[in-house]
Structures are given as structure tokens and as C-alpha cells.
């Protein structure tokens, strides 16, 4: 059966075909049939490739390109980003910082700024770089914050900033990321690679061979709307086929999740509820059943794995805790009845079973453990390396699972200095501090400078940095515990932010420089992050608005101030670079993919290389583990890691274990005071915080102008809350306002506020309520363990009540308070 967009959409009961394309696009499509004025240009985004109708110098309409058969409704929000009232329009400097020249931090966050010229702003930026390198050294400058940026091979804003700043002097940077910090650290010890960003078994192989698919804390229907590069959305065709197979009883799909997520509602598959943050006890009990009932694949364990005996001794209660991890032990913790645990374990070994893990589950305290334990369960099943079997950690991300064509995409603008180059301040003395820090521990540097922490087998001494340069990312979205951040930012002398949107990060900065959006400059990008379906020309749709500039131009002008502009740009313009990147790409793909000359490509705008060949992850390892070893120390799957064991960590030991959380709902620590688990997962209508500023699109989901909080109707009734009421959500770390949405997709004791909601404090003071609904006002800022030191955002419990006070205005949007 041919898979169409309609066949996919009709399964989502809460989403109509019109809403996915977007009413404004459907409404304007008929008018466009007779539109003869203006031009259409192709461009791209994290939300997919599109054609934009340009008339009178403005973007009038956006339509997905023909290759995208399952476009996301978020394309409707792109116009709202370009023309948002929250655009950074002019270079701005914080009033008190400029006025007092003493790096006054007590009023940081009051959003009062002075407009200055570009020359004044860049002079101040350069002055601060000089001062910090001269007075302190490279340890005092942090320029390592990164995020999703915008798409495009050339215009990577972080690369532009770090090359320019790096030409001036060295600086503190980071390792890891917020999305998969725990997972990408633990899995190389267990499976030999980070796995989370690796291409997975092709969907076609899974659909053809799997009898059971376990979606463990995984919501691909929601998350596949966006991609790291310009996304194709080809995965949705496979999900449509999966829906048909579920309906016919050909594949058994079970969602293991505290909530009934969008994918479960679309597929209409079975749902197995597990108490939040208790998947590990459930997994340990599964391992107990598989072992005691002799259901595990002993031959696979003996041939491909190391350390099973130590792990199974722990499961049997033969180690120091003396607790046997039976289903009866796990049931009161995880909320799954003992008989159901046994039934689930037995099902896993009946036929071919594919486990598909999500990322949210590892963003918690001890987040390394569920990924490690899941790998052990998959090893006991014994199907790793078989079509439709084994385990994946990425089938909800970008186009993982869509066969790759093998096309080698274009390179990018160089982040590092060219060979032989040295910075103006060629100083490598970091004063005993670590040059690289775990990405989620930077606030600790400000509050506990000089502290030595464990990290991944080594030691990190937290640097006492004084200045930050932030480009194209929003740490006041992706980091945790806003009030702790407020306290930490009092320690900073200077914060420079380069962005196109006035985020909370801009609010808490000292110098803000207006970058343009990706649709106000030219670029190229791979079409399909993992499928490498083709290549997209990203045409500039309109000229940069207000006084915004491309990052390339901003950094050229900065490097002019210390005589390095020509070296920075290599004497090339934007289009010189794009042409060069294309030609290098053409050369590297010679004999494999036919690519026209650049001018023809630029006019054509889209190169389509078709679909790739199916592939099975770990098949080569299974075929011959000696010739094709994993990247672990032994080359085998390490159920027990002696290397980790030698680290001597308390909270991440030599094999997967259950560690109680510092706080947990459903009878866990702290639940008597704050009984509800707050799930702050990836949003359905944004890419993290990108698109929250798009006013018309935000209005399609906001509740009374606030971020939605999803509540079980019985929990809401107990607190006198009705649909649409304003709700105050709170704990000891902070408080926020959100709009109530009542739904039985969320069990009692669980609420959801999606991450990426823009922080809008009522004031700069610690403890001020967030007026819009940023969940990171409430989350705790602790490392997952000594191993990964990753974010633990989902270890968060709260309480809530109907808000009955005077309703404050939302302060998140609209830019700064400009002071003459």
C-alpha cells in the first residue's frame, strides 16, 4: 500500500490533517493558485525544507517542498520567528553595566538596556576580551555554551564565534550535551559507542522482522517533527506502516511510559504504566525472571558479553545489599504488578523483539542506569545484531532508521584556528583549572569555583570564569534551577550574547548583538540528517531586519579590531564559502553521486539522491565479534565494566543497579510534601525554546497566554481546577504560572510542562514567579552521577494549586525595556 500523508494523519485522533499543514497554509493555497506576483524561494530549517512566497520584500506564505510527504505544522511558525516582536533589533547594552562600569550584577535580569551603535557594541565586546585575557587569563573566559543553533553548513553561529574568539585567546569549553549527557557517557563502556547519535537498524528491517516493539519512554511521533539538519520526515511513512501492522495484529507494540504519549495514541498500541524514575527496578526484575526461568540466551551471553555473573549475583541478592530483585521486590517501587512483570519478561523472548529507548529517561539522577540496564536486558534476550531485534537509543531522533544513501554532506565553517595560527593572547596557563568542563556543571563553576569533582574517570577543577560569550543558544532555557542561576550570574562580570531572539539569556546579559535569522542569509544543508536524502539550497528570503547581521559579518568586524579579519574569513565572502563547500562536497562524492555545477544547483535548489539500502545495527559484530569488535575495552558487550568499577564511584558502580533518588513521587523521598512528578520532556510544538517567540503559532497551544500544564482530571478536581484555569506550580526551588489542560493521558501523580517555555520572571529577584511557565524554574541542578555529571532535570517533584491572586502580565516576550 502506498503511504500517504493522509493515511498517517487519520490515526491521530487529536490532530486533523488541516492542523498539521496549518489552517493558514491551507487557506492561502487556493489563493496562491492565481497568484502571479512575487517570487518563490526554497529554504530549509530544523522543521523541514519549504518554499516561501516573497512579495513586497516580505515572506507571505510558506509551503513544504514536494518531497516532504509528512510536513510538520511547525512550518507555520517560521514567519512568526522572522517577524517576532521578540527579535533582537539593535545592539543593546545593560543600563547599569554601561553606566557604572563596575560590572554591577545586582540588577542583572531587570531587562533595562541602552541602545548603542554597532561600533560601540563591538568596541565594548573587544575591550572586555582584552581586559579578561590581560587581568586573568584564558581560564576566566567561558565560550563553550552550545545548542541547536539554526540549520546550514556555513552559518554555524557557534563555529563563527569560537573561531573569532579563539583568534583572540584561549577559553573554557565544554564536553557533552544536555540531550543525552548520561547516555552518551555510559554507552561507550557498555556497547562501544555513544549509540544515541548512531544510525540504527532500518525501519524496513524492523517492520519486516519484529514480532514485538517496545517503545520505552519513547515518543517518535512527537519528536521526529524536527531534525538536526533540514529534515525529510520520511520516518512517518514507516510509522504509518507500523500502525497498520498493529491494527492487523502483525506486530505487538507496547509503550512503557508514565504517560500515554502521542505515539501510543496514534498507533493505538498497548501501554504499560511505570512509576516515574523507577524503570531500573522493573528492568532488574525482568532480568531476574529471564534468569530464574532459564529464558535468557545463554549462548549469546557467553559469546558476546562479559561480566554477566557479577550482574546476576546482584540480581539474586548475593552481593552486599542482600536484596533479591524479584518482581515482588520491584512491584511496589515501579507500580507494575509482579505477575505483569513476569508476563512482560516472557513476552520479550517470544519471537523477535526490538527495544527502542527514548532520551528523556536518562535525563534524571542516576540517568546512566536505565540505559545500561536496558542494554543488559537486550543482551539477555540475545537478539542484538539481528534484523528487528536488539536495542536502539535513537529511533525518535532526526531520521535515524531511515536508510542512508551514503552521500557525504558538505563540511562547514572552521571552528578552530587554521594550522600554524596562534591567538593574539597565546596563553595556555589555565591557573590549575580544567580547560574543559562537563556541559551541565558550569553554574557550579560560578558558585563553587576551584572545587574538584569526579567526571568519567578523571578529575575536573571548576574554573572561576568571569566572562561568558554565548552565541545562538539559550542556556536560560536548557539549564536547570532558575533561581540558582540568578545567584550564579551575580558572580559574572560580563556576559555577551549574540542572537536573533530576545530570550531570557539576553535579559541576563550585558552586551547583546543582533544576529539575523537563517532566512536572512544564504546557506546549504544536507536534506535528511541521517538519511542524507539530498542537498538543499537555503536561499536568503529577505534582507536582515532592523540592524541585524549574519554571524559571519559580526565576527569579521570583531576580528578587525585586533587585525585578524582576513585570517578569520580566509579572504572569502559568504557566497565564496558556500560555493567552496559545495565544490568540496561534489569532489568527495565523485563517482558516487551526480552533482551539477554550483550555479545550476543554486538555481535548482534541491538535489534528491533517492533512498538508501537497509542496514542492521551491530550485525557485523554478531557475525564475527573477533574481526568486528565493539569499541569497549574488551571488544564485547560489557554487562559489568571493570573500568567503571575501578573508578570507585558511589552512584555509578561496575554494573547497572537501582539507586533511590534524592526526590521521587509515588511514595519516594519528598513525596509527602511535593507529591507530583513534573515531566519536562521535549515539546510538541517547538524545537526546545525555538519558535516559542512565534506569536500566532504560540497562540494555537497556549492557555490564557501561558504554557500548558497537563493534569489528570481527578488530580485537578481534587484541587478545584478546571480546564483553562491558571495554575501555580511550585516547590522549594521556585514557582511558575501555567494554564491547565485536563487529560487522562497523564496518570494521577504526574503532570507535564514541556521544556522550552520562555522564562519570564516577574522581577530579577531570586524567588520571583515565572509568569509564562518555564519548567526549569522548578528542576534541580545536580549531576546524574560522578560518571557523566549530566543534567537530572526529570528528577523533580512539585505541588500545584489554582492561582487566585492578581494575574501578572507575561514578561517573557517583546524584547528589552529600552532606556534612552
Curated annotation (Swiss-Prot):
Cofactor: Mo-bis(molybdopterin guanine dinucleotide)
UniProt key word Metal-binding: yes
Signal peptide: 1-33
Superkingdom of origin: Bacteria
PROSITE patterns: MOLYBDOPTERIN_PROK_2 (PS00490), MOLYBDOPTERIN_PROK_3 (PS00932), TAT (PS51318)
GO term, biological process aspect, one: anaerobic respiration
GO CC annotation, single: outer membrane-bounded periplasmic space
Catalytic reactions on record: trimethylamine + 2 Fe(III)-[cytochrome c] + H2O = trimethylamine N-oxide + 2 Fe(II)-[cytochrome c] + 3 H(+)
Cell compartment(s), UniProt: Periplasm
EC main group: oxidoreductase
Function noted in UniProt: Reduces trimethylamine-N-oxide (TMAO) into trimethylamine; an anaerobic reaction coupled to energy-yielding reactions.
Similarity field: Belongs to the prokaryotic molybdopterin-containing oxidoreductase family.
Protein name (Swiss-Prot/TrEMBL): Trimethylamine-N-oxide reductase
Gene (name only): torA
Amino acid at each position: 500500500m502506498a503511504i500517504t500523508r493522509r493515511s498517517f494523519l487519520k490515526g491521530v485522533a487529536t490532530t486533523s490533517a488541516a492542523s498539521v499543514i496549518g489552517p493558514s497554509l491551507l487557506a492561502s493555497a487556493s489563493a496562491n493558485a492565481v497568484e502571479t506576483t512575487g517570487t518563490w524561494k526554497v529554504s530549509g530549517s530544523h522543521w523541514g525544507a519549504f518554499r516561501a512566497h516573497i512579495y513586497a520584500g516580505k515572506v507571505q506564505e510558506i509551503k513544504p517542498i514536494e518531497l516532504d510527504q509528512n510536513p510538520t505544522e511547525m512550518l507555520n511558525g517560521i514567519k512568526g520567528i522572522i517577524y517576532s516582536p521578540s527579535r533582537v533589533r539593535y545592539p543593546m547594552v545593560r543600563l547599569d553595566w554601561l553606566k557604572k562600569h563596575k560590572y554591577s550584577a545586582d540588577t542583572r535580569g531587570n531587562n533595562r538596556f541602552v541602545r548603542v551603535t554597532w561600533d560601540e557594541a563591538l568596541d565594548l565586546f573587544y575591550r572586555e576580551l582584552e581586559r579578561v585575557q590581560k587581568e586573568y587569563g584564558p581560564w576566566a573566559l567561558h565560550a563553550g555554551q552550545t545548542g541547536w543553533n539554526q540549520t546550514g553548513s556555513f552559518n554555524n553561529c557557534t563555529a563563527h564565534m569560537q573561531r573569532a574568539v579563539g583568534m583572540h585567546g584561549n577559553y573554557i569549553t565544554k564536553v557533552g550535551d544536555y540531550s543525552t549527557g548520561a547516555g552518551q557517557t555510559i554507552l561507550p563502556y557498555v556497547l562501544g559507542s555513544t549509540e544515541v547519535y548512531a544510525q540504527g537498524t532500518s525501519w524496513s528491517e524492523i517492520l519486516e522482522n519484529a514480532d514485538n516493539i517496545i517503545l520505552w519512554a519513547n515518543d517518535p511521533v512527537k519528536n521526529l517533527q524536527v531534525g538536526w539538519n533540514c529534515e525529510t520526515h520520511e520516518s512517518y511513512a514507516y510509522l504509518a506502516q507500523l500502525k497498520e501492522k498493529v491494527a492487523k495484529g502483525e506486530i505487538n507494540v507496547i509503550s512503557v511510559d508514565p504517560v500515554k504519549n502521542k505515539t501510543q495514541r496514534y498507533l493505538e498500541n498497548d501501554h504499560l504504566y511505570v512509576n516515574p524514575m523507577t524503570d531500573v527496578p522493573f528492568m532488574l526484575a525482568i532480568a531476574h525472571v529471564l534468569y530464574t526461568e532459564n529464558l535468557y540466551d545463554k549462548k549469546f551471553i557467553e559469546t558476546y558479553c562479559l561480566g554477566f555473573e557479577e550482574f546476576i549475583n546482584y540480581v539474586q541478592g548475593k552481593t552486599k545489599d542482600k536484596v533479591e530483585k524479584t518482581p515482588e521486590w520491584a512491584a511496589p517501587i515501579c507500580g507494575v504488578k509482579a505477575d505483569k512483570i513476569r508476563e512482560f519478561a516472557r513476552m520479550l523472548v517470544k519471537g523477535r523483539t526490538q527495544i527502542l529507548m527514548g532520551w528523556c529517561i536518562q535525563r534524571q539522577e542516576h540517568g546512566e542506569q536505565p540505559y545500561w540496564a536496558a542494554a543488559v536486558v537486550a543482551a539477555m534476550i540475545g537478539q542484538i545484531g539481528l534484523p528487528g531485534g536488539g536495542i536502539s537509543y535513537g529511533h525518535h531522533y532526526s531520521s535515524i532508521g531511515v536508510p542512508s544513501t551514503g552521500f557525504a554532506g558538505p563540511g562547514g565553517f572552521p571552528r578552530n584556528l587554521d594550522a600554524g595560527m596562534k591567538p593574539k593572547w597565546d596563553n595556555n596557563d589555565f591557573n590549575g583549572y580544567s580547560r574543559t568542563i562537563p556541559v551541565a556543571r558550569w553554574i557550579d563553576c560560578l558558585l563553587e569555583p576551584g572545587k574538584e569533582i569526579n567526571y568519567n574517570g578523571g578529575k575536573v577543577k571548576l574554573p572561576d570564569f568571569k566572562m561568558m560569550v554565548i552565541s545562538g543558544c539559550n542556556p536560560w532555557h536548557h539549564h536547570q534551577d532558575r533561581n540558582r542561576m540568578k545567584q550564579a550570574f551575580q558572580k559574572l562580570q560580563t556576559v555577551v550574547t549574540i542572537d536573533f531572539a530576545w530570550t531570557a539569556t539576553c535579559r541576563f546579559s550585558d552586551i547583546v548583538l543582533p544576529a539575523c535569522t537563517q532566512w536572512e542569509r544564504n546557506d546549504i544543508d544536507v536534506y535528511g540528517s541521517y538519511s542524507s536524502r539530498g542537498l538543499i539550497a537555503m536561499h536568503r528570503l529577505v534582507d536582515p531586519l532592523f540592524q541585524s547581521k549574519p554571524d559571519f559579518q559580526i565576527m569579521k568586524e570583531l576580528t578587525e579590531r585586533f587585525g585578524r579579519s582576513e585570517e578569520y574569513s580566509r579572504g572569502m565572502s559568504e557566497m565564496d564559502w558556500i560555493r567552496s563547500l559545495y565544490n568540496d562536497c561534489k569532489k568527495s562524492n565523485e563517482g558516487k553521486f551526480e552533482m551539477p555545477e554550483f550555479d545550476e544547483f543554486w538555481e535548482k535548489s534541491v538535489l534528491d539522491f533517492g533512498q538508501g539500502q537497509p542496514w542492521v545495527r551491530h550485525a557485523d559484530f554478531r557475525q564475527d565479534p573477533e574481526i568486528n569488535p565493539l569499541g569497549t575495552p574488551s571488544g564485547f558487550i560489557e554487562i559489568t565494566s571493570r573500568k567503571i568499577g575501578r573508578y570507585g564511584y558511589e552512584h555509578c558502580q561496575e554494573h547497572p543497579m537501582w539507586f533511590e533518588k534524592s526526590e521521587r513521587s509515588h511514595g519516594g523521598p519528598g513525596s509527602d510534601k511535593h507529591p507530583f512528578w513534573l515531566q519536562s520532556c521535549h515539546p510538541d510544538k517547538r524545537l526546545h525554546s525555538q519558535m516559542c517567540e512565534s506569536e500566532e503559532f504560540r497562540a494555537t497551544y497556549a492557555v490564557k497566554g501561558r504554557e500548558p500544564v497537563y493534569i489528570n482530571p481527578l488530580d485537578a478536581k481534587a484541587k478545584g481546577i478546571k480546564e483553562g484555569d491558571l495554575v501555580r506550580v511550585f516547590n522549594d526551588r521556585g514557582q511558575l504560572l501555567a494554564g491547565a489542560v485536563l487529560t487522562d493521558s497523564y496518570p494521577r501523580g504526574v503532570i507535564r510542562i514541556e521544556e522550552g517555555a520562555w522564562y519570564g520572571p516577574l522581577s530579577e529577584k531570586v524567588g520571583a514567579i515565572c509568569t509564562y511557565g518555564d519548567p526549569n524554574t522548578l528542576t534541580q541542578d545536580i549531576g546524574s552521577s560522578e560518571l557523566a555529571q549530566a543534567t537530572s532535570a526529570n528528577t523533580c517533584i512539585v505541588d500545584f494549586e489554582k492561582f487566585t491572586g492578581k494575574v501578572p502580565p507575561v514578561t517573557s516576550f517583546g524584547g528589552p525595556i529600552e532606556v534612552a
